[in-house]
Amino acid sequence: MDSASDAGERRPARAALRVLSLIEQRVVAVLVEKQHTVSDSYPLSLNTLLLGCNQKTAREPVINATESEVLAAVDELKRLSLVIEVSGSRVARYEHNLQRVLGVPSQAAAILTLLMLRGPQTAAELRANTERLHRFADISSVEGFLDELALREPPLVVKLPRAPGSREARWAQLLGGPPEVSVAAPAGAAPEDLVTAGEIQALRANQHRLQAEVVMLRAQLHRLAAELGVDLS
């Protein structure tokens, strides 16, 4: 039975994670997803993880990460305890530790995973899209867990303003920082004041590229510090 306990009360504060980059979100979310959908292959090898990150379906946005970018993200997530490298295999394999780090049940982890994989969604969309990870009894069950996640300290999700013409509000996860909210252009705005969809897409692509570079540089810094015996904590 789905039950979000104490959904009406603010939960005790937990240690806040730093904001995760897009590639870091994608890596941990793919690990959660594949744990349920391809359990025979879980924990995942780097190659399988890369394929899941670059998957063309059920992903928003679609990315084209390199093996080195995914490995750098894995190294960073290991430092945050969100990913664990499993020993005892010829090939390195990885599993997630999302529920333990965030202190959330499997139902909430499924919701966060779909929000990281597919972007903001309504409660109804989340119920349909989480089917393979967790089967919620009804939409109100999803809403209960969303409310509980929103009441965390710091919050893990946020309810977005309802877009003009939309019947339901969408929810976004906050592990990647505050979501980008589209705002309707004011009436009478000049064409040169409007930003085209292509320009927005280009800016987001540039942002994602820079995030990946930061992750790689951070991983290289930690490796260098380890070699020199320097503590960066």
From Swiss-Prot:
One matching Pfam family: DUF480
The organism's place on the tree of life at top rank: Bacteria
Alphabetized InterPro entries for the sequence: DUF480, WH-like_DNA-bd_sf, WH_DNA-bd_sf
SUPFAM superfamilies noted in UniProt: Winged helix' DNA-binding domain
Homology family: Belongs to the UPF0502 family.
Name the record gives this protein: UPF0502 protein Mpe_A1449
